[in-house]
Amino acid sequence: MQKIRNIAIIAHVDHGKTTLVDKMLLAGKLFREGQAEPDQFLDNNDLERERGITILAKNVSINYKGYKINIIDTPGHADFGGEVERVLNMADGCLLLVDAFEGPMPQTRFVLQKAIQLGLKPIVVSNKVDKPNCRPEEVQEMVFDLMFSLDATEEQLDFPTIYGSAKQGWMSEDWKEPKEDITALLDAIIQYIPEPQVLEGSSQMLITSLDYSKYVGRIAVGRVHRGELREGQEIMLCKRDGSMVKSKIKEIDVFEGLGRTKVDAVQSGDICAIIGVEGFEIGETIADANDPEPLPTIAIDEPTMSMLFTINNSPFFGKDGKFVTSRHIYDRLMKELDKNLALRVVPTDSADSWLVYGRGVLHLSVLIETMRREGYELQVGQPQVIIKEIDGEKCEPVEQLTVNLPEECSSRIIDMVTKRKGEMTMMESKNDRMHLEFTIPSRGIIGLNNAVLTASAGEAIMAHRFLEYQPWKGEIERRTNGSIIAMETGTAYAYALNNLQSRGRFFIAPGDEVYAGQVVGEHTKDNDLVVNVTKSKKLTNMRASGSDDKVSLAPPTVFSLEDALEYIKGDEYVEITPNSMRMRKIILDELERKRQGR
């Protein structure tokens, strides 16, 4: 009888998932007394910490009362949907973490639906009950309604609820009586989460995730489904296409605390990492060499969006970056394919650009941002959705969009979404907020987030997820305003910007270096405007240069990477270097642009 519990944690961004896991690790005495307790232990790459999102699923385990609890952290974001399904396959139960004030959110729904379909047993944790005006009882009912609407079984609906505050480090069965520690939660896990079934027979393991090490290459991570795996065992890798490849296990590690520990053998029900198997894909089976039986493969989410990646060929090429040639960028993209599953890289006609396919703007921008920090320079074109031909009809990806926002600005948002070919499927009001659901083409979502936040003064919460391919919906107006383009290369002067303020809003500040063909602002009209922002005031001997009028300029609009990618038009690129991000026309020369435009 093994004392193992495999549990996945499901939560919305910023409901305290990573903090809770930190506290569970503490309870399992992973950090020695007196050793500094780290924050956000699981989000261990800088990007994850800054954005507060978990991108890659991770595994840790703790020992408690002689039980081994494997904790599997899932990404909450629908752009990383490929990660979610695979990871839930390793668990027997799930911890649904909700904020006692906000209640379950659209993104939580996405992961929870997958978990319920797989038949996982849930435990609900109502977090942040120490906050004033929290409403645990109402939230409890909301969770019940949500599970009911996702067709949960009676057994799943009979879930225990634990209340507490991960930040203060306590959990209790009654929210009015705080305890000292989180043992109430750990006891509930042992009591309610079923133990993994032990299946005797020839060994089988489904590869659900992979790790990468520069010493041994790709490492297969998964849960042993049946039998046991031993070090040095001869195995068969059952591929997706039905073929079999013989291989041998060099080393087996199990997860122990935050790291891995080498073991001789691992039994069914435990999660392990296997070193020495080459050329595997996620969703394939490792089986006994003498009697190979493949498990059903898992489908990985298809990409729905593509962007052109190309080398930086702007006049400021190579000023900041360490890696700037096409060779560097190509190698880096190939390396990313090893661990990023929903990604595809396709060469184009030219030797220095590639089409990169991904799950959405966020998915691709996380890759670009990671590359930027590593010292790469590159340029990226406008995001395009992937169009398929189904039964001779042109089809495009359609997503389900949920928006939660204050009632007074709902009409503006509905108008905005319907202009982008969205159709409303549901509308309900709760207290003073509206909950809206739409189906909308993926093309319509590009750039929508910004517009929705502006129209609702930052109050709206928006989430979307891929639904299916549907027939093409027709043209969608993206951005109607033209661009303001720099005429010459040089330094921008306040004097020039001041005279041009009536022409639109600027993205640059005085003193910034610009080059000819760079997009420096947004024109108030719908055509492009070429201006000289490098002009300074000419002075005679009579005028001292200091006695100029003080210039008052509106502050420049600053874009985040996603905003810029969603903002640019089809004839523009975003140039990304370690220290800066600029938008530019693909053809820098004005005369050449006019010639092409004819």
Locate predicted features:
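Active-site phosphate-binding and catalytic loops of NTP-dependent enzymes
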Residues: 30-57, 80, 146-159, 190-203, ...
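P-loop NTPase switch module centered on the Walker A-proximal segment
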Residues: 1-104, 142, 210-213
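Catalytic P-loop NTP-binding/switch module of NTPases
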Residues: 225-351, 373, 555
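Conserved catalytic-core segments of large NTP-driven translation/proteostasis enzymes
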Residues: 148-282, 286, 401-404, 465, ...
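Long insertion/accessory domains within large nucleic-acid-processing enzymes
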Residues: 255, 260-263, 395, 440, ...
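Charged, conformationally dynamic linker/hinge segments
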Residues: 292, 300-432, 445
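Conserved C-terminal guanine-recognition region of P-loop GTPase G domains, centered on the G4
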Residues: 94-156
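Conserved nucleotide-binding/hydrolysis micro-motifs of P-loop NTPases
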Residues: 15, 31, 77-78, 101-104, ...
